[in-house]
Regions:
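Helix-loop-beta segment of a Rossmann-like dinucleotide-binding subdomain
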Residues: 103-117, 169-178, 227-237
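NAD(P)-dependent Rossmann-like dehydrogenase/reductase catalytic/cofactor-binding core
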Residues: 4-5, 42, 187-246
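Rossmann-fold dinucleotide-binding core
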Residues: 77-154, 160
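Conserved N-terminal Rossmann-fold NAD(P)-binding element of oxidoreductases
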Residues: 7-11
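Short beta-strand "acidic-cap" motif of Rossmann-like dinucleotide-binding folds
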Residues: 29-35
Length: 246
């Protein structure tokens, strides 16, 4: 039996809804999912627990301002990107952060793990990792400095694939992963962006071997998601051919 992990969820998007659906039946939620406008905070029971902030990065300012001041140290930021300057400017640099490798179905029906590559750091790291595990997402607890490097890698992942997709007329990631020509361009993009990385943050520039290691890890993650997509597509096709409900 999965251990119950009491957390508060903020954000009703795909990830927030999927986490609520996974944790709610196990008693792992403390109060309702808090929505935009702060709706639901008055129903959250008192006490210290992680507050998983599942809003988009564009809504962070609003979500933090709506959070009761006494609960802000418990915030767990689930967004990608280099948030450190933004957090420090608001006195939130000591909060927990989570770096998620997963895919969420439209409507928040389910989450697909990205190979256990998700990472968590900060005061609520252990409980957050357990909550993610209860939802089927493997994660590891890492030191703050290591998290900064991993967060940069995830930001790089997003940047290179969006850039290449735009350059190829909006080609989906699954198509890029299967195209040898696209993979060659990806390696070039990664090397170019790593070369201009600020040395001061990590103390050195990434080596070419690290570039290739990172690229292979990223491709393995994408291939795992793409294989699930193809499997689901096959199930839908069989149901349609058999006259079953799709």
């Amino acid at each position: 039996m999965v251990e119950q992990v009491p957390v508060t969820l903020v954000g009703g998007g795909r990830v927030g809804r999927a986490l609520a659906g996974a944790l709610g039946p196990r008693g792992g939620l403390a109060g309702p999912v808090v929505r935009r406008g702060g709706r639901g905070w008055d129903e959250v029971p008192p006490g210290r627990r992680p507050v998983l902030l599942c809003t988009g990065a564009q809504h962070l300012e609003e979500a933090v301002s709506e959070c009761p001041p006494e609960r802000r140290p418990d915030l767990v930021f689930m967004q990608n990107g280099a948030l450190e300057p933004w957090l420090a400017a608001r006195g939130l640099e000591g909060c927990t952060r989570a770096l998620l490798y997963l895919s969420a179905e439209e409507g928040g029906a389910a989450l697909k793990d990205g190979g256990g590559r998700s990472s968590v750091t900060g005061p609520w790291a252990v409980v957050t990792r357990e909550a993610l595990g209860a939802a089927g997402i493997g994660a590891r607890e890492v030191p703050r400095r290591d998290f900064g490097r991993l967060a940069f890698e995830k930001l790089l992942w997003s940047s290179v694939f969006w850039c290449l997709s735009a350059g190829r007329g909006g080609a989906p990631v699954g198509e890029l992963v299967q195209d040898p020509g696209a993979l060659s361009e990806l390696e070039g993009l990664v090397a170019e962006l790593l070369a201009v990385r600020i040395r001061a943050q990590f103390g050195r520039i990434f080596e070419l071997a690290e570039c290739r290691r990172w690229l292979e890890n990223a491709l393995n993650f994408l291939r795992s998601l793409f294989s699930v997509y193809l499997a689901n597509l096959g199930i839908v096709k069989k149901r349609a051919e058999g006259g079953g409900q799709v």
